[in-house]
C-alpha cells in the first residue's frame, strides 16, 4: 500500500499500518515530483506523488496506480529528481548508472528497462547525487562467495536507455552478486 505524508524527516516508527503490513521504503521528495520503481523483472513504473493518498489512512494498493504482472514485486524505488542518479545492479554482476529522471514512463504497464539473464534478479537500487556518480565516489560489490571488489563509480557510464549494463564484477559459476554499497568519506561501507 502507498501513501504520502507532507513534510520531511518523519519518524517512521510512529506510523501505523494494517495488520500484516509494514514499512518497505520511504522516499523524501516534493509533492509535485514523480517517483519510479523497478520490479524484479526489470520493468520500470512511474507514479505522480500528488496522486498518492494522504498519510493518515491506510493508503491505496500499488495495483491501483500501475499494472504489475502477476506475482511481480518492487525491487526498489527512485525519486525522479533531475539532480539524482541511481546505481542499478543485477545478481549476475552487471549494472549501470542512470539519471533518475531518465527512467520515467507514462505507461501504466511500465516499460522494460533492465535486461536480466536467466535466474537473475535486481538488487535494490542506490540513489545518490548525480555529481557524486561522476566524481570520486567508490562503490563496493560483495559476491556470494565473500569476494569484495571496490572501484570508482565514475568508471561506469551513465546510461539513459537501460539494457544489460556493464560488468561490475566477474563471477564464477554458481556465484552471484549479493550486495552493492557506496563507500563513505571515511572508507566505511
Q: Where are these predicted regions, by residue range?
A:
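Short, structured "edge-of-domain" segments at secondary-structure transitions
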Residues: 1-189
Amino acid at each position: 500500500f502507498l501513501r504520502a505524508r507532507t513534510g520531511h524527516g518523519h519518524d517512521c516508527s510512529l506510523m501505523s499500518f494494517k495488520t500484516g503490513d509494514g514499512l518497505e521504503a520511504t522516499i523524501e521528495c516534493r509533492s509535485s515530483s514523480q517517483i519510479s520503481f523497478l520490479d524484479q523483472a526489470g520493468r520500470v513504473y512511474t507514479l505522480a506523488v500528488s496522486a498518492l493518498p494522504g498519510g493518515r489512512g491506510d493508503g491505496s494498493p500499488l495495483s491501483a496506480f500501475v499494472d504489475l504482472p502477476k506475482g511481480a514485486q518492487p525491487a526498489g524505488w527512485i525519486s525522479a529528481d533531475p539532480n539524482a542518479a541511481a546505481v542499478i545492479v543485477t545478481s549476475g554482476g552487471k549494472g549501470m548508472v542512470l539519471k533518475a529522471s531518465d527512467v520515467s514512463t507514462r505507461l501504466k504497464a511500465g516499460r522494460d528497462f533492465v535486461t536480466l539473464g536467466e535466474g537473475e534478479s535486481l538488487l535494490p537500487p542506490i540513489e545518490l547525487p548525480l555529481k557524486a556518480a561522476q566524481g570520486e565516489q567508490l562503490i563496493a560489490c560483495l559476491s556470494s562467495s565473500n569476494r569484495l571488489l571496490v572501484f570508482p563509480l565514475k568508471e561506469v557510464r551513465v546510461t539513459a536507455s537501460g539494457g544489460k549494463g556493464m560488468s561490475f564484477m566477474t563471477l564464477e559459476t554458481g556465484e552471484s552478486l549479493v550486495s552493492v554499497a557506496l563507500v563513505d568519506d571515511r572508507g566505511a561501507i
